[in-house]
Regions:
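Absolute protein N-terminus
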Residues: 1-2
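Well-ordered alpha/beta subsegment
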Residues: 45-50
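Short aromatic-glycine-(Arg/Gly/Cys) micro-motifs in beta-strand/loop hairpins
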Residues: 5-34, 53-55, 62-70
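A structural signal for short, well-ordered beta-strand elements
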Residues: 38-39
Length: 70
């Protein structure tokens, strides 16, 4: 089982989504305003957790492709 740490960007992107990233994602390195979501076995669970916290969450195209809707 491969567990990774995820965070959600608190600043929505141009489409209104709060992107969820693995903390090791190179596209997350520039994010200064984020909330750690915790450890999950897959990105879908991380995005579901962010949505349960009230975010309009979507997975990062690069590190959370299975949870990326657009």
């Amino acid at each position: 089982m491969n567990i990774k740490i995820y965070a959600v960007n608190l600043t929505p992107d141009e489409k209104g989504y709060n992107e969820v990233h693995e903390t090791s994602c190179s596209h997350a390195k520039s994010i200064r305003n984020f909330e750690l979501l915790g450890c999950f076995t897959d990105e879908i669970k991380a995005v579901e957790n962010a949505k349960a916290r009230g975010y309009n969450a979507d997975g990062c195209y690069y590190c959370c492709r299975n949870a990326h809707k657009g």
